[in-house]
Amino acid sequence: MNLLFLKIYRSREEPQRRGERLFEFYNQCSRLGYDEFRSFVNEWISQLAASDQAEIVSRMSRGGDRQFKSGLVELLVHASLRALNLKVIVHPALEGTTKRPDFAVLDGQDRVVAYIEVTTVNPPNLTDAEENREAPIYNAIDQIKLTVGCVFGYDVTRAGTSSPPLAPLIKDIDAWVKASITEKPERKVTRRFIAGDWELELDLFSGGSLQHDRAIGMTSGDVGWIAPHLDLRSALEVKSKRYGELEASYLIVVADAKGQLFGADSTKSALTEAVLVF
């Protein structure tokens, strides 16, 4: 049997690092609940045929976060169908095309009663590329040793096209911190830093009594429109035409990997708007 998570000794307690792959984090973390998560995923994989196990293990362990998330959704859907005592075929063949949907559900006479396709709404590729370039900057600042009671607020005010040299940036930040604490003992001071074609804004908060493990205590993210119904509609439009006319019901499962859906009400609202227009 192919396993995504092998039985190894794990002692890591730290949270996920900026730029770290989800698989690496979930494979190493020893916090409460993570053993159970790994056990669930391995059990779901064991329900697949051997060839399908190898494919999804390779995709989730060697690919990026998109591949990990999409594989996780596929496993969850397959396990849910199995839990309903349904007979499921993975990647069933279709006449007249080499394309294969994710699943087919069979009745008692082994006739296909439904095809199921899983898709994930992801952030744009540009966002992923920017995050990968930013990760070394963030992690270098996060590892700065601050005095007791100090912590950074962190924001990217202009993203660059490449990762800049880090040593001059960290040296500049260290000097600013020391000067701010001794010359301007205020609870909050702010400064912008230029590193290559990147522009960062740091807030230095001081006056507390805790020794923080990490230098960055809060971050500001990009502000953008939240329009999950548009993403749902786009996913439905693309997948609805993928296999042409089918002789059975066709169900499209859309997973949100952009963090736009916040609960049952927002999901229902987004789905209603998407389907009404679609």
Regions found by a protein language model. Give the residues of each.
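Short alpha-helical segments and helix-capping/turn motifs at coil-helix boundaries
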Residues: 88, 98-102, 233-240
